[in-house]
């Protein structure tokens, strides 16, 4: 009997949710990305890579350099997008030792 009343309550809530009008005036969430152009200095990120054992004493330092370009060059990886002057570009990153 409890199960039946629980199912009826869930069915009632689902029907109420579907019957409510959708608010078309809801605000949009806009996320802004940092603006980077190809002529500006590249973004450089220092990373510490850990060895297989995860031991911090075996850490080696490497640098990842990122540019905003229309296309990634050889050995660069597409790491997302960036915007400049209402244009969207590819964020191209390259790992150097």
Curated annotation (Swiss-Prot):
<dbReference type="GO" id="GO:0071222">
    <property type="term" value="P:cellular response to lipopolysaccharide"/>
</dbReference>
<dbReference type="Pfam" id="PF00879">
    <property type="entry name" value="Defensin_propep"/>
</dbReference>
<dbReference type="GO" id="GO:0005615">
    <property type="term" value="C:extracellular space"/>
</dbReference>
<keyword id="KW-0964">Secreted</keyword>
<keyword id="KW-0165">Cleavage on pair of basic residues</keyword>
<keyword id="KW-0044">Antibiotic</keyword>
<feature type="propeptide">
    <location>
        <begin position="20"/>
        <end position="61"/>
    </location>
</feature>
<keyword id="KW-0929">Antimicrobial</keyword>
<protein>
    <recommendedName>
        <fullName>Defensin-A2</fullName>
    </recommendedName>
</protein>
<dbReference type="GO" id="GO:0019731">
    <property type="term" value="P:antibacterial humoral response"/>
</dbReference>
<keyword id="KW-0732">Signal</keyword>
<dbReference type="GO" id="GO:0061844">
    <property type="term" value="P:antimicrobial humoral immune response mediated by antimicrobial peptide"/>
</dbReference>
<feature type="propeptide">
    <location>
        <begin position="96"/>
        <end position="97"/>
    </location>
</feature>
<dbReference type="InterPro" id="IPR016327">
    <property type="entry name" value="Alpha-defensin"/>
</dbReference>
<dbReference type="InterPro" id="IPR006081">
    <property type="entry name" value="Alpha-defensin_C"/>
</dbReference>
<feature type="disulfide bond">
    <location>
        <begin position="72"/>
        <end position="92"/>
    </location>
</feature>
<keyword id="KW-1015">Disulfide bond</keyword>
<dbReference type="Pfam" id="PF00323">
    <property type="entry name" value="Defensin_1"/>
</dbReference>
<feature type="signal peptide">
    <location>
        <begin position="1"/>
        <end position="19"/>
    </location>
</feature>
<comment type="similarity">
    <text>Belongs to the alpha-defensin family.</text>
</comment>
<dbReference type="GO" id="GO:0050829">
    <property type="term" value="P:defense response to Gram-negative bacterium"/>
</dbReference>
<dbReference type="GO" id="GO:0002227">
    <property type="term" value="P:innate immune response in mucosa"/>
</dbReference>
<feature type="disulfide bond">
    <location>
        <begin position="66"/>
        <end position="93"/>
    </location>
</feature>
<feature type="disulfide bond">
    <location>
        <begin position="68"/>
        <end position="82"/>
    </location>
</feature>
<keyword id="KW-0211">Defensin</keyword>
<comment type="function">
    <text>Has antimicrobial activity.</text>
</comment>
<dbReference type="GO" id="GO:0051673">
    <property type="term" value="P:disruption of plasma membrane integrity in another organism"/>
</dbReference>
<dbReference type="GO" id="GO:0050830">
    <property type="term" value="P:defense response to Gram-positive bacterium"/>
</dbReference>
<dbReference type="InterPro" id="IPR002366">
    <property type="entry name" value="Alpha-defensin_N"/>
</dbReference>
